[in-house]
């Protein structure tokens, strides 16, 4: 069976099928990295295998595109360390935005196409974090946050270490994003990967098989659901004839269906990182310790679908990118001695939107996300203000927050899926902008009905 027939049998284009085959191939390629003997050999293998898979997936030009942010990051570290992080951030994002605009990648993805822009998105985050951590390496530890202390780089990585980190076995295809310091310790057998001090080497095979089985289930469910809930339905006359509840139910199912594609992709990338050994994140504290593989984890499916609060969504969806946004945007916008507020949240969501592309649907989704999280916090504060003795009322507030999250998340997700301004507004307007009005209403209401703690704070002795 040729590529065209194979692609047709599963309903994708030849380009997407080629990418999927190379993407799945990252699992055996990453496994082979385990048997590469030396530290230098691991760096060379990681860089070469990543570049080769990129060539097979997207063509020769993809590696030329990848060289641009990689060069920006390395040159900024070599030339001007005091500002290398901010230089890489703005120049790296500028190039990524240029590629988004030139290739109109969102339209290609929406129509079943593929290009290297998605991999460039992951690579951009990796080079920025590396530069920022190298910048942090020259700062005093006392003024740094815990994440900065943990990930700071005292010495500049060599060029081959840098290339291996950026392209490691195709991990730039869909993530997860990881830190340069972790990559170096993994290749050198240091830190949690040190097996010289009577530490046993964790076996990755059970966790890898679980991730592969999860990927298979996710893909099967996605292929079953996607013909039943096409995104084109939002602009069809039949959709406008439906009642409010049916329209809203369709929005929920369209968002639910789309998420399984991402669950599949992240499960494959998780399997790839786990089997290489890089996904190892330490041992549990049980009497009989078990290995943890959280470094590779990018999604908690049940955590997303059953989230009790919108605040939990960034902790369980695209986990490593959410962590990156928290460490390199959100926390760095907070001045010392002050608390983060809505500005930091909105700025972080804006960066996330720009990272995805300059489509109106992305912008509206991430602004909606900021409103959704802020509204969910209001409900939570009201819940916490209820006396513990009123357990039933507290549980009702928890359930209300769950329903609120389901409603606003799937309403907001339409913009992320359809991308265009007209289609997004048509879908939002068809349900009377309920997913926008409710969060804004909650935020405004919080000023009228502020939450008071259920127990007054004890007065300090004078």
Swiss-Prot record:
Gene Ontology MF term list: 1-acylglycerophosphocholine O-acyltransferase activity; 1-acylglycerophosphoethanolamine O-acyltransferase activity; 1-acylglycerophosphoserine O-acyltransferase activity; acyltransferase activity; lysophospholipid acyltransferase activity
Class of the enzyme per the UniProt entry, highest EC level: transferase
A cellular component term, taken from the record's GO annotations: extracellular region
Active site (record annotation): 356
Protein localization: Endoplasmic reticulum membrane
Phenotype of the disrupted gene, per the record: No visible phenotype under normal growth conditions, but the double mutants lpcat1 and lpcat2-2 show increased contents of very-long-chain fatty acids and decreased polyunsaturated fatty acids in seed triacylglycerols.
The UniProt record lists the keyword Transferase: yes
UniProt-listed GO biological process terms: galactolipid biosynthetic process; glycerolipid biosynthetic process; phospholipid biosynthetic process; triglyceride biosynthetic process
Mode of membrane association: Multi-pass membrane protein
Keyword field contains Cell membrane: no
UniProt keywords, alphabetically: Acyltransferase, Endoplasmic reticulum, Lipid biosynthesis, Lipid metabolism, Membrane, Phospholipid biosynthesis, Phospholipid metabolism, Transferase, Transmembrane, Transmembrane helix
Catalytic activity line of the entry: a 1-acyl-sn-glycero-3-phosphocholine + an acyl-CoA = a 1,2-diacyl-sn-glycero-3-phosphocholine + CoA; 1-(9Z-octadecenoyl)-sn-glycero-3-phosphocholine + (9Z)-octadecenoyl-CoA = 1,2-di-(9Z-octadecenoyl)-sn-glycero-3-phosphocholine + CoA; 1-(9Z-octadecenoyl)-sn-glycero-3-phosphocholine + (9Z,12Z)-octadecadienoyl-CoA = 1-(9Z)-octadecenoyl-2-(9Z,12Z)-octadecadienoyl-sn-glycero-3-phosphocholine + CoA; (9Z,12Z,15Z)-octadecatrienoyl-CoA + 1-(9Z-octadecenoyl)-sn-glycero-3-phosphocholine = 1-(9Z-octadecaenoyl)-2-(9Z,12Z,15Z-octadecatrienoyl)-sn-glycero-3-phosphocholine + CoA
Transmembrane segments annotated in the record for this chain: 9-29, 52-72, 84-104, 158-178, 211-231, 263-283, 353-373, 396-416, 431-451
EC number, as in UniProt: 2.3.1.-, 2.3.1.23, 2.3.1.n7, 2.3.1.n6
Tissue: Expressed in roots, rosette leaves, petals, stigma, chalazal endosperm of developing seeds and vascular bundles of siliques.
One Pfam family named in its UniProt record: MBOAT
Free-text function comment from the UniProt entry: Lysophospholipid acyltransferase with broad specificity. Mediates the conversion of lysophosphatidylethanolamine (1-acyl-sn-glycero-3-phosphoethanolamine or LPE) into phosphatidylethanolamine (1,2-diacyl-sn-glycero-3-phosphoethanolamine or PE) (LPEAT activity). Catalyzes the acylation of lysophosphatidylserine (1-acyl-2-hydroxy-sn-glycero-3-phospho-L-serine or LPS) into phosphatidylserine (1,2-diacyl-sn-glycero-3-phospho-L-serine or PS) (LPSAT activity).
Record family assignment: Belongs to the membrane-bound acyltransferase family.
Name of the protein described by the UniProt record: Lysophospholipid acyltransferase 1
Protein's organism: Arabidopsis thaliana
Lineage of the species this protein comes from: Eukaryota, Viridiplantae, Streptophyta, Embryophyta, Tracheophyta
Gene name, Swiss-Prot/TrEMBL: LPCAT1
């Amino acid at each position: 069976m040729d590529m065209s027939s194979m692609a047709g049998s599963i309903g994708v284009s030849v380009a997407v099928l080629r990418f999927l085959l190379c993407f799945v191939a990252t699992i055996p390629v990453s496994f082979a990295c385990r048997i590469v003997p030396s530290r230098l050999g691991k760096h060379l293998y990681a860089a070469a295998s990543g570049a080769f898979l990129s060539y097979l997936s997207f063509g020769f030009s993809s590696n030329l595109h990848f060289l641009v942010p990689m060069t920006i990051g390395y040159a900024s570290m070599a030339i001007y360390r005091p500002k290398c992080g901010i230089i890489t951030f703005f120049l790296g994002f500028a190039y990524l935005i240029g590629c988004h605009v030139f290739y109109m990648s969102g339209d290609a993805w929406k129509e079943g196409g593929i290009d290297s822009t998605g991999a460039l998105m992951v690579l951009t985050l990796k080079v920025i974090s590396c530069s920022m951590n190298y910048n942090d390496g020259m700062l005093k530890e006392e003024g740094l946050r815990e994440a900065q202390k943990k990930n700071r780089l005292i010495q500049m990585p060599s060029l081959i270490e840098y290339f291996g980190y950026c392209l490691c076995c195709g991990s730039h295809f869909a993530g997860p994003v990881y830190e340069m310091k972790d990559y170096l310790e993994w290749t050198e057998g240091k830190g949690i990967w040190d097996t010289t001090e009577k530490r046993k080497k964790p076996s990755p095979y059970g966790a890898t098989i679980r991730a592969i089985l999860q990927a298979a289930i996710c893909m099967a469910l996605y292929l079953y659901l996607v013909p039943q809930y096409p995104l084109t339905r939002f602009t069809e006359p039949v959709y406008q004839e439906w009642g409010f509840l049916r329209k809203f139910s369709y929005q929920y199912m369209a968002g639910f269906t789309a998420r399984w594609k991402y669950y599949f992709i992240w499960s494959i990338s998780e399997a790839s990182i786990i089997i290489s050994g890089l996904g190892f994140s330490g041992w549990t504290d049980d009497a009989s310790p078990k290995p943890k593989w959280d470094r590779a984890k990018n999604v908690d499916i049940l955590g997303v679908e059953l989230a009790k609060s919108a605040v939990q969504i960034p902790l369980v969806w695209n986990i490593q990118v959410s962590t990156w946004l928290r460490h390199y945007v959100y926390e760095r916008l907070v001045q010392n001695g002050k608390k983060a507020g809505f500005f930091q949240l909105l700025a972080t969501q804006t960066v996330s939107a720009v990272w995805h592309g300059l489509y109106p649907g992305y912008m509206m989704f991430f602004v909606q996300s900021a409103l959704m999280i802020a509204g969910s916090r209001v409900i939570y504060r009201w819940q916490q203000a209820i006396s513990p003795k009123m357990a039933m009322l507290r549980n009702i507030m928890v359930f209300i927050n769950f329903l609120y999250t389901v409603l606003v998340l799937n309403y907001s997700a339409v913009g992320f899926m359809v991308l265009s301004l007209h289609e997004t507004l048509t879908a939002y307007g068809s349900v009377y902008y309920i997913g926008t009005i409710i969060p804004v209403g909650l935020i405004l209401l919080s000023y009228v009905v502020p939450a008071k703690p259920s127990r007054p704070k004890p007065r300090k002795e004078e």
